A protein has these predicted regions:
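Short, well-ordered beta-strand micro-motif
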Residues: 46-48, 141, 183
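Glycine-rich phosphate/pyrophosphate-binding beta-alpha loops
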Residues: 10, 98-100, 204
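Dinucleotide-binding Rossmann-like beta1-alpha1 core, especially the glycine-rich loop
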Residues: 4-79, 83, 89, 206-208
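Helical element adjacent to the flavin cofactor pocket in flavoenzyme catalytic cores
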Residues: 93-151
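Active-site substrate-recognition segment that forms the wall
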Residues: 26, 30, 35-40, 129-132, ...
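Glycine-rich FAD pyrophosphate-binding loop
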Residues: 1
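General beta-strand structural signal in soluble alpha/beta enzymes
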Residues: 73-76, 121-123, 154
Length: 217
């Protein structure tokens, strides 16, 4: 949602999410050129102040290295101020390979590329039932007719729990949480050349401040 391209250090060791994050990060520069969307490899900092913060950052950095993430560096207050003058902190972990992307342009570029390669879109087409056939294909019932397919990819966002239920994979529920974005004027853009995060907790990455490819904060 924020348009941040992560470095792969924040995810559990050996997880699929970590693997795909590191691989996707490496691909992003070439992909941006090929599909013509905005991407800036500007880096990212996780800012800390306490001894506990430092220990957490060290663990985070080691986890990142185990995941294959590269160019991770612990920096002192002076170096942090040089990178992001508007941020106050005693130290930080600097992820050189992190960056930002225009999430709207990126999504549209992927959709256009998929369409050019034969993908068909059916908008306003709600899935109401899915039945697995004896030949291991699926009959998908929608508000605009039925479809038969060999594969079903569940990417229904907030509705993915309902799709899972239709496939007999029960027990997954999406617990929604509301987030607010405050967009500042482009005059503030020079104050923040890269995304800034607090030291992560066990539950989430925290509230961030980030620059955008359009020059806002």
């Amino acid at each position: 949602n924020s348009g941040v391209v992560h470095g792969g250090f924040a995810y559990d060791r050996g997880s699929l999410k970590a693997k795909l994050c590191v691989e996707g990060n490496k691909m992003m520069g070439d992909l941006a050129k090929e599909l013509d969307f905005h991407f800036i490899r500007c880096g990212k900092v996780l800012v800390g102040n306490t001894e506990e913060d430092m220990e957490t950052l060290k663990r985070t950095m080691e986890q990142g290295k185990d995941n294959g993430a590269t160019n991770l560096e612990l920096i002192d207050e002076k170096r942090l101020h040089e990178l992001v003058p508007a941020v106050v902190g005693k130290f930080a972990m600097f992820s050189h390979n992190s960056g930002i992307v225009d999430p709207f342009g990126y999504t549209i570029a992927l959709a256009e590329n998929a369409h050019a390669n034969g993908v068909e879109y059916h908008f306003g087409c709600e899935v109401t039932a899915i039945r697995r056939e004896d030949d291991d294909t699926y009959e998908i019932t929608t508000t605009k007719g039925n479809f038969k397919t060999r594969w079903v990819v569940n990417c229904a966002g907030l509705g993915c729990g309902k799709i899972s239920d239709m496939l007999g994979i029960t027990g997954y529920r999406i617990i929604g949480s509301k987030g607010d974005y405050i967009i500042l004027d482009k005059r503030t853009g020079p104050l923040l050349p890269m995304p800034v995060y607090p030291v992560p907790s066990n539950s989430y990455m925290g509230i961030l401040v980030t620059n955008t490819t359009g020059g806002n904060v």
